[in-house]
């Protein structure tokens, strides 16, 4: 029977080869994609457990299927740990992704066609913050806000001005490519001044919030959404937090039956593991090192003529670089670095002139390399290698030197 096929490699060699190739890539490459990380074996074990066999529509104690006693325990553990981790009164751990979490939060907070303020994509916002190609921009009337063109920092006075002009029902704070601290108290003041709700998407900074390395949005936001991977170092998934009991009920309904059916209890189990790991004091040490590594890289990039640090540097786990002045666009930089065992992604910048498929910049994060064991010395070396490749993008001899150095570095810190 097929269920007896325990030898994955011999049963499905094509798929096994692809997975093995990805394992080799992760071993050999310096991972700088800011939304990626390296999870623990415990997280992977939970996600690969027998819980994947179980359907459990509904919520603990109120399921539409029988035999859910064990998964109720699993989900309640995840909920309780999430609440403890972020100081929330209510947590929904069922969203399959951050986008699913945002979709449900919108359903709970506003109606189709309502006006919403969200961060512009070029300024560092996310697709689900109102991009015209996304469900958010198609379903709701999003008005974008950006950053100050000189400082490239959030301009709270300008955001207030826009809010007063358009009178939004909801303001969305949070970003996917913003390297500085976000003042949630100011966002709360702006929202209150126009009678709007405040939603914070902390997907990128959740790990920092959990340890106090970034201000917690929970005291200010009506609803907080997040992913459970990225800096939180858990499985790919989403979560919604609130301190409002009425909104909590609306959120639960928006997830099930509103936007999802059965929850992925094996993923929820992995979330529970990650939350327990994040509650350990060692996780705070990890996040502290992430920030140190990011700032070490920023210091090195600041020395390179032709590279420009967006917003002048970083307060969190990521930084953005304009590379166009080196005669290479973001997509070309991404492909070039991938060829020398360094992985990052192209990124639009606030004064973007190119298409989203090219971009003028790249985004760099330190979460994964820190999980691998890199400290400031290695982070500086990484920045030097990235810079060397970008500056010498048409010099094959120099690129080969970078490739060898990158392999030597990853060999010193095996996964």
Curated annotation (Swiss-Prot):
A biological process term (GO) from this entry: glycine biosynthetic process from serine
Q: Which Gene3D superfamilies match?
A: Aspartate Aminotransferase, domain 1, Type I PLP-dependent aspartate aminotransferase-like (Major domain)
Gene Ontology terms for molecular function: glycine hydroxymethyltransferase activity; pyridoxal phosphate binding
Positions marked as site (Plays an important role in substrate specificity): 229
What keywords were assigned to this record? Answer: Amino-acid biosynthesis, Cytoplasm, One-carbon metabolism, Pyridoxal phosphate, Transferase
User: Where along the chain is (6S)-5,6,7,8-tetrahydrofolate bound?
Assistant: 121, 125-127, 355-357
Primary subcellular site in the record, as a coarse category: cytoplasm
The UniProt record lists the keyword Transferase: yes
Tell me which family the UniProt entry assigns to this protein: Belongs to the SHMT family.
**Modification sites for N6-(pyridoxal phosphate)lysine:** 230
Enzyme class per UniProt: transferase
Tell me the function of this protein: Catalyzes the reversible interconversion of serine and glycine with tetrahydrofolate (THF) serving as the one-carbon carrier. This reaction serves as the major source of one-carbon groups required for the biosynthesis of purines, thymidylate, methionine, and other important biomolecules. Also exhibits THF-independent aldolase activity toward beta-hydroxyamino acids, producing glycine and aldehydes, via a retro-aldol mechanism.
Summarize the subunit comment: Homodimer.
Q: What is this protein called?
A: Serine hydroxymethyltransferase
Q: Does the keyword Cytoplasm apply?
A: yes
Q: Its gene? A: glyA
Reactions catalysed, semicolon-separated, are:
(6R)-5,10-methylene-5,6,7,8-tetrahydrofolate + glycine + H2O = (6S)-5,6,7,8-tetrahydrofolate + L-serine
